[in-house]
């Protein structure tokens, strides 16, 4: 394949990609770092993205681009640049006989970190299939989610979500040139990326831009997916050295001149103990925008938006891992005293519930009885805490999404649960939490969908390899056909059915070390307990 044959003409100008061989021996082509927006620098910092200017000379897109600014916890340093609103395209070939369906992936990271780079999201496994895989960078932290209240400042927030919206539109306008079908786009995301997918499903700004969605371990029903405004702009500016003159507009002017590294270094230090008790996960994340604009993503409470969501008409595959809550042990390892805090259970009753303190205390007692009936929490006895965090932080939000779909949608909802527990291949648990722990942590499933910096491929006779091929097969089948039933489910003698809309208990495809099974969700009774905390129509 010549270099000329790897040159593609986009709406904005020609780009050159390269030919690769995957870790599994599959030839594929890649285009990395294609601009989909102008660099959000100077006066464009914090604002909604602007489409790129056109170019005439062929742009070299054979190398990975820098990520958006963030603190990389794996590398323990601030990385990135501002000129990073770039998109990546991977496929077996760019001239297929018929256009291929597209999987457009949004990375997670709590809206504060993350990258589309191949060190975490390599295409080696998914390019086995007849799909086009697309990933992209979007702004995170304060640079992506700073919100000013005055319309005059022109920074209503959610710039990171608006980056995503522009990237989706770029795909519709350009993916045909790469062999993709703009009429068969599946929007997929993990964690904060999954919540982002749901924001686009409930926002009219993204209406009808894609045909299916995959939601992995994240939901707009989870409290961490929405930030409340508490004068964060001025607090951030003061932390960096602003003199306090000019109010919020003065703070914005100061922050536009500040070094991005200083913004990243100070943004997460703003949260107080009270903020965290009030369930504020980050100062800078998705927020209800203070006024309407043409690009507005969240005009009102997401809970209300979801009730008339355009996305209820399209199919969804949704799920998570069996021990999502292992993620929260990172904080407990640093602050083990939290497990013995007298308000451990009371503090995990959702603070936004409109109930009396007496009722809160009653629910706290139920949490204690359910997760620690005959013992007390400790680092040595952390399984109850892991289960409580799995349910509260991740699975209950997913459950509320599933219930809302059952009540309001006629489209299909497929639910999966991943419990692949490997001693060496659950990379997130091993490298970021604790290699001595067992279970399938939040983000562990990503190693079975995407290649990463470890360059590991399990042996073909292992359950890890079978799990990898199962996830790739199920996900790509949904992208291609809208039906996740595939060779790996058939091999296991399983039919992966959509959830019935009349049954309160949902079923899921359970992907485990010993194979696949279609079962009642194993921990449904725990989720029912969380459901009971909500009254009337507050659940969904």
Curated annotation (Swiss-Prot):
Entry EC no(s): 3.1.1.1
Presence of the UniProt keyword Oxidoreductase in the record: no
SS bond partners: 68-81
Glycosylated residues in this chain: 452
Active site (catalytic residues): 191 (acyl-ester intermediate), 324 (charge relay system), 442 (charge relay system)
InterPro entries in alphabetical order: AB_hydrolase_fold, CarbesteraseB, Carboxylesterase_B_AS
Keywords: Disulfide bond, Glycoprotein, Hydrolase, Serine esterase, Signal
SUPFAM superfamilies linked: alpha/beta-Hydrolases (SSF53474)
Pfam family, one: COesterase
GO molecular function, one term: carboxylesterase activity
Top EC class of this enzyme: hydrolase
Reaction(s) catalysed (UniProt annotation): a carboxylic ester + H2O = an alcohol + a carboxylate + H(+)
Function noted in UniProt: Overproduction of nonspecific esterases is a common mechanism of resistance to organophosphate insecticides.
PANTHER family assigned: CARBOXYLIC ESTER HYDROLASE
Entry's family note: Belongs to the type-B carboxylesterase/lipase family.
Comment field (misc): There are two such esterases: A and B. Alleles of both A and B are known.
Descriptive protein name: Esterase B1
The species this protein was found in: Culex pipiens
Gene: B1
């Amino acid at each position: 394949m010549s270099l000329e044959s790897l040159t593609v003409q986009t709406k904005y100008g020609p780009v050159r990609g390269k030919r690769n061989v995957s870790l599994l021996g599959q030839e594929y082509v890649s285009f990395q770092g294609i601009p989909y927006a102008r660099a959000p620098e100077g006066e464009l910092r914090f604002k909604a993205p602007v489409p790129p200017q056109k170019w005439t000379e062929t742009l070299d897109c054979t190398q990975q681009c820098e990520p958006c600014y963030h603190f990389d916890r794996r590398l323990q340093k601030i990385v990135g640049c501002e000129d990073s609103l770039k998109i990546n395209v991977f496929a077996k070939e760019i001239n297929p006989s018929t256009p291929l369906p597209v999987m457009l992936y949004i990375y997670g990271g709590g809206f504060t970190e993350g990258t589309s780079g191949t060190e975490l999201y390599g295409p080696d496994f998914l390019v086995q299939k007849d799909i086009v895989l697309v990933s992209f960078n979007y702004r995170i932290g304060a640079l992506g989610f700073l919100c000013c209240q005055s319309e005059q400042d022109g920074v209503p927030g959610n710039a990171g979500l608006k980056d995503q919206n522009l990237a989706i539109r770029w795909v519709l306008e350009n993916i045909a040139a790469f062999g993709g079908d703009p009429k068969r786009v599946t929007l997929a995301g993990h964690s904060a990326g999954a919540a982002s997918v749901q924001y686009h499903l409930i926002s009219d700004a993204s209406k009808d831009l894609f045909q299916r969605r995959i939601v992995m371990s994240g939901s707009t029903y989870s409290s961490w997916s929405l930030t409340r405004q508490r004068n964060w702009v001025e607090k951030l500016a003061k932390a960096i050295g602003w003199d306090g003159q000019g109010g919020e507009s003065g703070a914005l002017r100061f922050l536009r001149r500040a070094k991005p590294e200083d913004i990243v270094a100070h943004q997460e230090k703003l949260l107080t103990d009270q903020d965290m008790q009030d369930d504020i996960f980050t100062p800078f994340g998705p927020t209800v925008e203070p006024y309407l604009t043409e690009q507005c993503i969240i005009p009102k409470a997401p809970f209300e938006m979801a009730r008339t969501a355009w996305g209820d008409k399209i199919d969804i595959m949704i799920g998570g891992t069996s021990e999502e809550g292992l993620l929260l042990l990172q904080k407990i390892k640093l602050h083990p005293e939290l497990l013995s805090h007298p308000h451990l259970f009371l503090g995990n009753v959702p603070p936004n519930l409109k109930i009396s303190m007496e009722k809160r205390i009653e629910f706290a007692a139920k949490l204690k009885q359910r997760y620690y009936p005959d013992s007390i929490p400790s680092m040595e006895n952390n399984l109850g805490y892991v289960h409580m965090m799995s349910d509260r932080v991740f699975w209950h939000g997913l459950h509320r999404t599933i219930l809302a779909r059952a009540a309001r949608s006629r489209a299909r909802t497929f639910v999966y649960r991943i419990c692949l527990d490997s001693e060496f291949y659950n990379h997130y648990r091993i490298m970021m939490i604790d290699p001595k722990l067992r279970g399938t942590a939040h983000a562990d499933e990503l190693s079975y969908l995407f290649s990463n910096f470890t360059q590991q491929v399990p042996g073909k006779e292992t359950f890890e390899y079978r799990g990898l091929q199962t996830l790739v097969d199920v996900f790509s089948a949904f992208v291609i056909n809208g039906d996740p039933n595939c060779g790996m489910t058939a091999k296991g003698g399983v039919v992966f059915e959509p959830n019935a809309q009349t049954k309160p208990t949902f079923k899921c495809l359970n992907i485990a070390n010993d194979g696949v099974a279609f079962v009642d969700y194993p921990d449904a009774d725990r989720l029912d307990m969380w459901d009971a905390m909500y009254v009337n129509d507050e659940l969904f």
